[in-house]
Curated annotation (Swiss-Prot):
GO terms for biological process, alphabetical: double-strand break repair
Gene: rad50
Named cofactor requirement(s): Zn(2+)
Organism: Methanococcus maripaludis (strain DSM 14266 / JCM 13030 / NBRC 101832 / S2 / LL)
Entry keyword set: ATP-binding, Coiled coil, DNA damage, DNA repair, Hydrolase, Metal-binding, Nucleotide-binding, Zinc
Subunit structure comment from the entry: Homodimer. Forms a heterotetramer composed of two Mre11 subunits and two Rad50 subunits.
Protein name: DNA double-strand break repair Rad50 ATPase
SUPFAM superfamilies for this protein: P-loop containing nucleoside triphosphate hydrolases, Rad50 coiled-coil Zn hook
Record function comment: Part of the Rad50/Mre11 complex, which is involved in the early steps of DNA double-strand break (DSB) repair. The complex may facilitate opening of the processed DNA ends to aid in the recruitment of HerA and NurA. Rad50 controls the balance between DNA end bridging and DNA resection via ATP-dependent structural rearrangements of the Rad50/Mre11 complex.
Gene3D superfamilies noted in UniProt: Helix hairpin bin, P-loop containing nucleotide triphosphate hydrolases
Cofactor note: Binds 1 zinc ion per homodimer.
Pfam families assigned to the protein according to its UniProt record, in alphabetical order: AAA_23 (PF13476)
Keyword Coiled coil found: yes
Family, per entry: Belongs to the SMC family. RAD50 subfamily.
Length: 993
């Protein structure tokens, strides 16, 4: 796979980033946190869209964005692929293009296709193509055992260990099932015993059931006989009751028919009587109707002319009123000689005189107010002079009171501060108590933490010893191997030395063979001894590692407790400081002990002087507002205007003028009223003359109407009797649906019909009474038969219940037998199941032992991969142009370079070996690898090692494309392409150089 381009929108810190890649080395350079590693994370997401915390949408999407997208273009086997992944909060939009054509759209389909194209999954991609920070240096520095574990993870062997662990869980669940089955199978003897017991009980119940069935059949026969007798009696009882009911109905109907006959007779009498009344009152009835018509005609005429008549009467009333009022006015005006205009001029002159008097009256009031003000000024002057000393004392007391108030505020602030300090002290004391209880384990943990450096030194010493012993053991094993080879060669030789080809005797050959055997034995003994020492040291190291791990596990808690310890010291210091402040405040507060008494004293003094101060202040304000000289000048001016007038004189003159004014107004009104009334009287008299003819006719019609009404009253009684009788006859006519003239005939006919029907009913009654005697029903015999039947029925029901109970018990027992038979069958099935599980458990043990155990398939994979890793490692190592030819990865995962332990090489050479090994592992995992991504490969390396690594990178030819993520600027020197990443605000910006 060769990466061509990556595009990111709203992905982590990349708002809108596009990077083109080419073959060779691409250095992605930027400071920590600039967004370099996000570029690889985007590639990983584009290819496989993995799940997990690191790939959660909220963690990948920029804050405030509604979506993010990643596009990756790459080449593989001559084809161009473009993967597009877009994510919203609740929606996905993925596409895969092959050579520009849409190939897949769903996320799962794209993931599957990518795995098919690359021939690797996400796990292999993450381990083979992406080399994480520190992996290169760590491969050399770690022990063979740790190296074995790391390489196992990179190769994916650890999944077989996990599978082995999961198989233990499965195996355990089967073991639990076996225990459960064994427990259930213990019930079998008890179930068989219960089954036999139930079968015996069923046989006994069947015999009892047969006996009861015989009794049941005899009683049922007797019950049917007695039931037949009762049914016959019930029929007689029903027939007798029906006849009695019929007789009762006939008697009732005869009674009703007689009532109807009587009602028809009564109606016939009433019709005759009402017909007579109609004949007697018919003449006056007709006369009444004629009078009523005439009255109605006159009434219509009166209504038509009523308005004219009422208008005439109203005009006559007004005429009388006007004549009367004109007479009164003429009497009142007999002494007046002036016309209205002259009188109005006199009224105007009178009003002007009244106005002058009102103005003088206002001036008198103004003068009285000024004299009052002058008097009050004198009073207030005297008040100010009298209270001057009291006011001065009051002002001094106010100043003193303000000073005391300021002191009181200070005092209250001190009290508040004291309260706050006491509260703070209480809280700190509680906090201290809490911290003391939480810090009980602190000293023990601290003591263990303090031993860490010492343990680490010992651990490192042991590691060095182990490495040295391993080196010695390797050398000795190499020597043993050489001796064995020499011995084997010597054994093959007949008469010449295998080394120098010189002649050798059999004795010399035996001597040399013994020497080789002796050397081999000595070296083997020495090696065994060293291995025992090594095992002891490894055990010590492992125990020490356990202790160090324990210390590591304590570190987090220790950190928390350390913080709490420091915090507790601060709390203690704060308690001391707060206590000192509290003591100091208490001293200051005591200085204010007499303050309240002083304030009370001054408050009483101010209270006593307050009225004097207010009075004096009011008088001073009054004198400021009112100038005495101005009031005196005004008094003089007003006195000149008023002259010898006083209020009494003005009132008398004004009263005379008002009386004259009223007289003039009254005379003017009467003169004008007389003229208007005369005009109105003339108009009314003309209207009266026009209406006099109509009024005479109206009076005549009223007289005629009154005469007719009197005559109508005389005929009214006969009219009402006629109408009442007619209403009765109409009611009968409506009731019987017959004309009034045919009522007599109809009622006589009805009476005859009803009498005839009544005679027939009497005959039926006689017949029913005879039938009742014929039935001959006896209630006593019927009751005795019912009691006997009831006793038989009760006995029958008792037997039936017993029979049902036995049947129910039999059914239940048979069901229990079926249930127990099923249970026995189930237990038989469980025996089979137990056998199968035991066989399958043995099969699982075999699979685990032969495939998933460390000595099974895992061992096979390691043995398969070690030569493959070694071959790829050496191919890459050859490109580095170093003075070494061969790297050996031994079975125990120790590294040998040209026969020397890797630890004996220089730092730069070790890095070269480590890089070759890491790339070799990648190629072993993914044979067709063309691209490698290295994340901070120079991390944790000193300057010399970094320089060596740069030179090595230049020499790599096996891998077509390398992307190096780094913050070291030196990597620009070896790069074919440079991508610089920097953080501006919250966004990453990329530039190509």
């Amino acid at each position: 796979m060769i990466i061509k381009n990556i595009k990111m929108e709203n992905f982590r810190s990349h708002r809108n980033t596009s990077i083109n890649f080419s073959k060779g080395i691409t250095s992605i350079i930027g400071q920590n946190g600039s967004g370099k590693s996000s570029i690889f994370q985007a590639m990983n997401f584009a290819l496989f869209a993995p799940r997990g915390n690191n790939f959660r949408i909220e963690n990948l999407m920029q804050q405030g964005a509604a979506s993010f997208s990643v596009e990756l273009e790459f080449e593989m086997m001559g084809n161009t692929y473009l993967v597009k992944r877009k994510r919203f909060q609740h929606k996905t939009d993925d596409k895969l293009y092959v050579n520009g054509k849409l190939n897949a759209e769903s996320a799962s389909e794209i993931n599957k296709k990518i795995e098919e194209i690359l021939e690797i999954d996400n796990s292999v991609f993450s381990n083979a193509i992406y080399i994480k920070q520190g992996e290169i240096a760590n491969l050399i520095q770690m022990t063979p055992r740790d190296r074995k574990e790391v390489i196992g993870k990179l190769l994916g062997i650890e999944k077989y260990e996990k599978a082995s662990e999961k198989m233990n869980i499965v195996k355990k669940s089967y073991e639990e099932t076996l225990l459960k089955l064994e427990g259930e199978l213990t019930q079998e003897p008890e179930i068989l015993e219960n089954l036999e017991k139930l079968k015996n009980e069923v046989s006994e119940s069947e015999i009892l059931k047969e006996e009861i069935l015989k009794k049941y059949e005899n009683l049922e026969k007797l019950k049917l006989e007695k039931n037949s007798e009762i049914l016959q009696m019930e029929e007689k009882f029903a027939e007798n009751n029906q006849l009695k009911e019929n007789l009762k109905d006939i008697i009732s109907e005869i009674k009703n028919i007689n009532l109807e006959i009587q009602n028809f007779k009564n109606s016939l009498n009433l019709v005759a009587e009402e017909s007579k009344n109609i004949s007697e009152n018919e003449e006056n009835y007709k006369k009444y109707l004629e009078l009523e018509l005439k009255i109605k005609e006159l009434n219509n005429k009166l209504i038509g002319h009523k308005s004219n008549y009422e208008s005439y009467n109203k005009l006559k009333t007004i005429e009388e009123s006007l004549l009367k009022e004109l007479g009164v006015l003429k009497e009142s005006l007999k002494d007046n000689k002036k016309n209205p205009d002259e009188l109005k001029e006199n009224l105007k002159e009178n009003d002007e005189k009244i106005l002058i008097l009102d103005k003088i009256k206002e001036k008198i009031k103004e003068l009285e107010f000024i004299e009052k003000q002058i008097y009050e000024i004198k009073i207030h002057k005297k008040t100010v002079e009298t209270l001057f000393d009291s006011v001065k004392i009051y002002d001094d007391s106010i100043k003193t009171f303000e000073e005391l108030k300021t002191k009181k505020n200070s005092y209250e602030n001190l009290l508040k501060e004291k309260f706050d300090l006491e509260k703070k002290l209480q809280n700190e004391t509680d906090e201290k108590t809490k911290l003391i209880s939480e810090l009980t384990d602190f000293e023990k943990i601290e003591e263990k933490i303090n031993l860490e450096n010492e343990l680490k030194e010992k651990y490192e010493d042991l590691s060095e010893k182990i490495d040295k012993l391993n080196e010695i053991v390797l050398k000795k094993e190499s020597k043993i191997s050489e001796y064995k080879n020499s011995k084997a060669e010597l054994e093959k030789t007949k008469d010449s030395c295998h080394v120098c080809q010189s002649k050798i005797t059999e004795e010399k050959k035996q001597e040399l063979l013994e020497k080789y055997n002796s050397e081999i034995q000595n070296e083997q003994l020495s090696t065994e001894s060293l291995k025992k020492q090594l095992e002891i040291i490894l055990n010590k190291k492992e125990k020490m590692k356990v202790k160090l791990n324990e210390i590591d596990s304590f570190k987090l808690k220790y950190g928390e407790l350390k913080e709490k310890k420091n915090y507790s010291l601060k709390v203690e210091e704060s308690i001391i400081e707060t206590t000192e402040k509290l003591n100091e405040l208490t001293g200051k507060i005591n200085e204010y002990s007499s303050l309240n008494d002083e304030i009370s004293l001054i408050e009483n003094k101010l209270k006593n002087l307050e009225n004097d101060y207010k009075n004096c202040n009011y008088s001073s304000q009054f004198l400021t507002k009112n100038d005495e000289s101005e009031f005196l000048t005004k008094k003089l001016e007003l006195s000149k205007i008023i002259g010898d007038y006083d209020s009494s004189k003005i009132e008398n003159e004004k009263k005379s003028l008002e009386n004259l004014k009223d007289e003039l107004k009254n005379t003017i009104y009467n003169l004008e009223r007389e003229i208007n009334l005369k005009k109105e009287l003339k108009n009314i008299q003309n209207d009266i003359s026009s209406k006099i003819g109509i009024v005479e006719c109206y009076v005549k019609w009223e007289t005629e109407k009154s005469d007719f009404e009197n005559k109508l009253s005389e005929c009214k009684e006969n009219y009402e009797k006629y109408m009442e009788s007619l209403a009765v006859l109409k009611n009968y006519s409506k009731t019987y649906s017959v004309e009034i003239n045919n009522l007599n005939e109809f009622l006589n006919q009805k009476i005859a019909e009803k009498q005839q029907f009544c005679e027939k009913l009497l005959e039926t009654r006689t017949e029913i009474e005879k039938n009742i005697q014929t039935v001959n029903y006896n209630p006593e015999l019927h009751e005795n038969a019912k009691r006997l039947y009831e006793n038989i029925l009760n006995e029958f029901n008792d037997i039936l219940r017993t029979l049902e109970r036995i049947s129910s018990e039999l059914k239940l027992k048979n069901e229990n037998i079926s249930y127990l038979n099923e249970k026995i069958q189930n237990l038989s099935n469980k025996k089979e199941e137990k056998k199968k599980i035991e066989e399958f458990k043995e099969y699982l043990d075999k699979i685990k032992r032969e495939i998933f155990s460390k000595d099974g398939f895992q061992k096979y994979l390691r043995e398969k991969y070690i030569p493959l890793i070694q071959r790829h490692t050496n191919q890459i190592f050859q490109e580095f142009e170093l003075p070494y030819s061969h790297i050996q990865l031994k079975d125990d995962y120790s590294l040998i370079v040209d026969g020397l332990p890797v630890e004996t090489l220089s730092g730069g050479e070790q890095i070269a070996v480590s890089l070759a090994l890491r790339l070799g592992i990648s190629k072993a995992v993914c044979n067709n690898i063309e691209c490698i991504i290295l994340d901070e490969p120079t991390a944790y390396l000193d300057e010399d090692r970094r320089k060596n690594l740069l030179n090595i990178f230049k020499n790599i030819k096996t891998i077509n494309q390398m992307a190096i993520i780094t913050h070291h600027q030196e990597l620009e020197q070896i790069a074919d392409n440079i991508v610089k990443v920097r953080k501006i605000g919250e966004n990453s910006k990329v530039s190509l150089e």
